[in-house]
Every structure is written in structure tokens, then in C-alpha cells.
């Protein structure tokens, strides 16, 4: 879910914190990418015809592999240095949100069955997409693919967004790429949306600067975290009737969730019981992440051509010639990136 209404709130109140950028402007930059978010979008969009998804001869879905392979090649060809971060075990507080997602998927399954009986193709496609879930196997497939491509993979101890933000805050990467705005709540100093969108959508990358977010909203980081909790996050329910603009007004007026709750009109706003905002706040400010000293140096190595042929062509039915061509693209892209870094070094001498 991310943070409800945060993008519009920033556009209205801190417009200088966000700017459109060209994809290629991140040449040579290390970018931490939320892997699960990308895999989900590939499963929903790539190669889908109505309710049918791309599969191999064994009937196993391959949309995630095709999407990850092609999109990562595009990233590498632009000279970017991607680091894919995979989710670990979710915090217990996220159980409520995960249960809601499960309920929505189950409801979508029922609606899909009804649409099939009625022969309503538009509804069939719509509800089919809502049944999509990223599985353990999808993640394992993509981890294997990325390693064969010579791209670094990080296993987060808990939330990928938190791990990405930590890598950014400690200078291990230049920016975080995701579609969930809670990357900012976790403290990403530089956050990118639409980096992994397909070329066909022609969307520019939207870059958010955390310092300018706080400056534009006239908030401290602690107050920004409280604002995001009040807007609505994955950890606790919202207070009905309080949207993003009202949340900002209340935070500016009272300074903290404690003061807001002390002064809130209880007749007008019903506070959920329980409403463990302190624990939600702790998860944003002190998430379970890999300590900076334990993060290894990231290395982008040459692709394992033989391994890629075996995995993609022999095991998953990809076209041999296309995979061979793609491998050459990866090799050329990595050489280009290395040469670019060398030129940059010379320019600084």
C-alpha cells in the first residue's frame, strides 16, 4: 500500500522536492531496487493476454523471468548499476495488511469465476490481475537469473524498502527505486519512481529529495514519520476522516502523534482501538536491516553465458538466439559502464 496520498501531498506542498529525470541521467549510479515490487509488476503486465500468462513447456509461469531479464538489460545498457533487494520475513505488525491483501485476492478469485461464467472478458482480465501473488519460487527464479547476469542481489532480513533505504542512507547506493512511497518514510535520501516502468509507457523517472521534502513541508524527520503513519501505512489502520492534507495540518499544529491524540475531537474522529502507533513509528525509525559494516562491496561481474542458456533456454523454453543476443548486450553494457567510469576518473584528474 505504501503511504496513502503522499505523492499528491508533496506535489501540492513541497513541489521542489520532486523532479522529472531522464532514465539515462543515472549513468554510473548504484541504484537499490525493490525486487518484489518489480516482480509483481512483471507478473501483472508482461506477456499477458486476457487471463493467460506466459509459461514454459511445463506450464510454469515465466512472465517474471522475461520481465526481469529484459528490464535489467535496459538498466545496464543505460549505464546504471542495479542492486536488487529481496524481502525477508515481514514484521508481525504487517500481518493485518497482509491479511487484507489475501482477502482481496480471494474476493478477486470469486469475481473472476463469476466473470468467466458471464463471459465478460474485460472483467476477466481485471480480476485475473488482482489474483497475482509473488511466490517464493518467483523470488528464487529471479535471484538465480540476476546472479547469472552478474548483478548483485541482497537478501533483506525483513522489509526490502527498509533495507534499500539503509543502503542509501549509508552511501552504499546513490538512490532507491520502488513504487512504494514508504521508501521515504524509512529515510531514503533519494528516491526514484517509474525507473522500472516499461518503455512503452513513456514515463519519466520521478526523483524525490528527502531533504527538500522536509524543507518543503516544514517538518523534522520524526514529524514526517508521524505524518506518514497518520496518512495511512501498512502497519496500522487509519483514523477515518483524516486524509493526507488534514494529517499535515494536524502535525504542523501539534508536532507529534501524542499531542494530536490529546487534542483530537473524539466525537468527530474515531481512533481505532488498539492503535499501536508507537510500534509503527519504531518500525520506520529502527527497522531490522543489515548493519552497514556487514554489507559487502557490490560487484557487477560478467554474465555466465553457459548458465543463462541452461536456465533460460533449456529449463524455461526461451528462444536460444534471443538469449544469445541478450547476453552480448549485457557484455557490451558492462564494458560501456566500465569505460564510462574510467573517463570520469580521468576528467577528475
UniProtKB/Swiss-Prot annotation:
Keywords assigned by UniProt?
A: DNA damage, DNA repair, DNA replication, Endonuclease, Exonuclease, Hydrolase, Magnesium, Metal-binding, Mitochondrion, Nuclease, Nucleus, Phosphoprotein
Give the note describing cofactor binding and stoichiometry. Answer: Binds 2 magnesium ions per subunit. They probably participate in the reaction catalyzed by the enzyme. May bind an additional third magnesium ion after substrate binding.
Does Cytoplasm appear among the keywords? no
PTM comment, free text:
Phosphorylated. Phosphorylation upon DNA damage induces relocalization to the nuclear plasma.
Highest taxon in the source lineage: Eukaryota
**What PROSITE patterns does this protein's entry cite?**
XPG_1, XPG_2
Q: Does the keyword Repressor apply?
A: no
For the biological process aspect of GO, one term held by this record is: base-excision repair
Could you tell me the gene encoding this protein?
A: FEN1-B
Which residues does the annotation say bind Mg(2+) 1? 34, 87, 159, 161
Oligomer and partners: Interacts with PCNA. Three molecules of FEN1 bind to one PCNA trimer with each molecule binding to one PCNA monomer. PCNA stimulates the nuclease activity without altering cleavage specificity.
Pfam families linked to this entry: XPG_I, XPG_N
Q: What is its EC number?
A: 3.1.-.-
Name under which the protein is recorded: Flap endonuclease 1-B
Amino acid at each position: 500500500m505504501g503511504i496513502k496520498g503522499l505523492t499528491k501531498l508533496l506535489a501540492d506542498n513541497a513541489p521542489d522536492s520532486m523532479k522529472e529525470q531522464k532514465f539515462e541521467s543515472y549513468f554510473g549510479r548504484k541504484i537499490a531496487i525493490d525486487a518484489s515490487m518489480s516482480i509483481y509488476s512483471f507478473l501483472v503486465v508482461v506477456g499477458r493476454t486476457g487471463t493467460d500468462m506466459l509459461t514454459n513447456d511445463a506450464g510454469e509461469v515465466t512472465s517474471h523471468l522475461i520481465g526481469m531479464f529484459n528490464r535489467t538489460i535496459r538498466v545496464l545498457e543505460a549505464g546504471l548499476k542495479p542492486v536488487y533487494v529481496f524481502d525477508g520475513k515481514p514484521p508481525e505488525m504487517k500481518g493485518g495488511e497482509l491479511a487484507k491483501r489475501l482477502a482481496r485476492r480471494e474476493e478477486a478469485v470469486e469475481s473472476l469465476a463469476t466473470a468467466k461464467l458471464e463471459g465478460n472478458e474485460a472483467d476477466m482480465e481485471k480480476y485475473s490481475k488482482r489474483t497475482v501473488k509473488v511466490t517464493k519460487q518467483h523470488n528464487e527464479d529471479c535471484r538465480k537469473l540476476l546472479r547469472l547476469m552478474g548483478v548483485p542481489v541482497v537478501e533483506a532480513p525483513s522489509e526490502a524498502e527498509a533495507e534499500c533505504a539503509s543502503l542509501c542512507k549509508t552511501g552504499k547506493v546513490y538512490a532507491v527505486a520502488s513504487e512504494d512511497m514508504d521508501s521515504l518514510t524509512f529515510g531514503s535520501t533519494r528516491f526514484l519512481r517509474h525507473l522500472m516502468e516499461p518503455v512503452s509507457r513513456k514515463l519519466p523517472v520521478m526523483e524525490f529529495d528527502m531533504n527538500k521534502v522536509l524543507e518543503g513541508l516544514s517538518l523534522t524527520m520524526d514529524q514526517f514519520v508521524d505524518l506518514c503513519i497518520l496518512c495511512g501505512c501498512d502497519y496500522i489502520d487509519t483514523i477515518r476522516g483524516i486524509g493526507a492534507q488534514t494529517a499535515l495540518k494536524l502535525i504542523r499544529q501539534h508536532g507529534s502523534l501524542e499531542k494530536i491524540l490529546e487534542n483530537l475531537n473524539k466525537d468527530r474522529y474515531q481512533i481505532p482501538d488498539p492503535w499501536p502507533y508507537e510500534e509503527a513509528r519504531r518500525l520506520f525509525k529502527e527497522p531490522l536491516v543489515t548493519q552497514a559494516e556487514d554489507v559487502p562491496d557490490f560487484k557487477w561481474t560478467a554474465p555466465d553465458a553457459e548458465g543463462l542458456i541452461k536456465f533460460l533456454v533449456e529449463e524455461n523454453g526461451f528462444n536460444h538466439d534471443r538469449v544469445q543476443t541478450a547476453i552480448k548486450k549485457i557484455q557490451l553494457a558492462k564494458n560501456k559502464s566500465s569505460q564510462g567510469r574510467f573517463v570520469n576518473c580521468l576528467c577528475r584528474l
